[in-house]
């Protein structure tokens, strides 16, 4: 990473964290993270959609909005997007459209909820359904912690949207890495403010670096890599700094952290076909059973209580 990108990334991280602190009001940072990280993720999916559609339709000299209005084009772009991206965001639900609504003071939180519902419904029946199912469930837009009225909640989310729009997320060719790194930075910052809760979803950089270096020693290509207690997926994803990893497998007990792990995979540019993150207790039910992995890393909750049931002896 050259110095200019590194400097930009540092500036981006600082701005995002300052924004998170400025907007959260009286809400605990640990709770507010679901809204900030959720909207950054939505921004990424929307931005990715815009670029994908521009490239897909460039030879037809037609905009995404116009293609959507034409039934024949609409069917084709939906099919292509589901195959390549795994989801569809309608033109009216793009992040840039929400920015315009905020500027015109016509945005309300129910529109955002409709946008999320539409995105999630687009994955139903597709190969990506399991990877996207419930991804935004922790971003509870009807929570009174966000505001006591729809107007109050809309105002908070409008500020987040406007603030994200003002941030320069990076150079085109490096956008995934810069945004992915910034996302991971925020996870780390939220972890630091959460105290004892931090271990649920984040392995500190130093231990993570050492684990991945040792696990990939002498390896160039890794077909399958796994983390049985994957948290937010940051440790598992760090493996790609030391080897070419094709498929990622993880299991996470906490549903909120499980959602973070899947978001993290997608933000890092891992295709939905190349990761399988499962929500459940690895000790009680190992989702991957007798599968063999070339590399495994883990930072399990060492102090957690667990059952001494006799079936563990089998």
Regions found by a protein language model. Give the residues of each.
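Non-catalytic, mostly N-terminal accessory regions of nucleic-acid modification and defense proteins
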Residues: 1-215, 273-282
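Conserved S-adenosyl-L-methionine
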Residues: 197-298, 303-305, 310
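Conserved catalytic motifs of ABC-family nucleotide-binding domains
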Residues: 312-314
């Amino acid at each position: 990473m050259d110095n200019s990108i590194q400097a930009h990334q540092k500036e981006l991280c600082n701005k995002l964290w300052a924004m998170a602190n400025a907007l959260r009001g009286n809400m605990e940072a640990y709770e507010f993270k679901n809204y900030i990280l959720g909207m950054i993720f939505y921004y990424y999916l929307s931005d990715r959609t815009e670029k994908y559609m521009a490239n897909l339709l460039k030879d037809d000299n037609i905009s995404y909005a116009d293609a959507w209005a034409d039934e024949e084009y609409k069917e084709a772009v939906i099919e292509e997007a589901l195959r390549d991206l795994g989801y569809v965001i309608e033109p009216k639900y793009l992040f840039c459209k929400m920015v315009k609504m905020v500027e015109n003071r016509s945005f309300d939180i129910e529109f955002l909820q409709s946008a999320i519902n539409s995105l999630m419904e687009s994955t139903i029946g597709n190969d990506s359904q399991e990877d996207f199912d419930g991804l935004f469930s922790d971003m509870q837009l009807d929570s009174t912690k966000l505001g006591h009225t729809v107007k109050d909640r809309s105002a908070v989310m409008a500020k987040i949207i406007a603030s994200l729009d003002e941030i320069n997320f990076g150079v085109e060719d490096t956008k995934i890495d810069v945004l992915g790194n910034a996302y991971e930075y925020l996870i780390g910052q939220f972890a630091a403010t959460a105290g004892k809760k931090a271990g649920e979803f984040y392995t500190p950089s130093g231990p993570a670096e050492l684990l991945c270096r040792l696990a990939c020693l002498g390896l160039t290509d890794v077909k399958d890599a796994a983390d049985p207690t994957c948290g937010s997926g940051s440790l598992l994803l760090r493996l790609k700094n030391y080897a070419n990893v094709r498929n990622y497998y993880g299991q996470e007990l906490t549903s909120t952290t499980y959602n973070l792990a899947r978001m993290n995979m997608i933000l890092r540019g891992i295709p939905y076909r190349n990761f399988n993150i499962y929500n459940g207790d690895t000790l009680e039910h190992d989702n991957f059973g007798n599968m063999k992995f070339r590399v495994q890393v883990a930072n399990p909750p060492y102090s957690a209580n667990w059952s001494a049931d006799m079936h563990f002896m089998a």
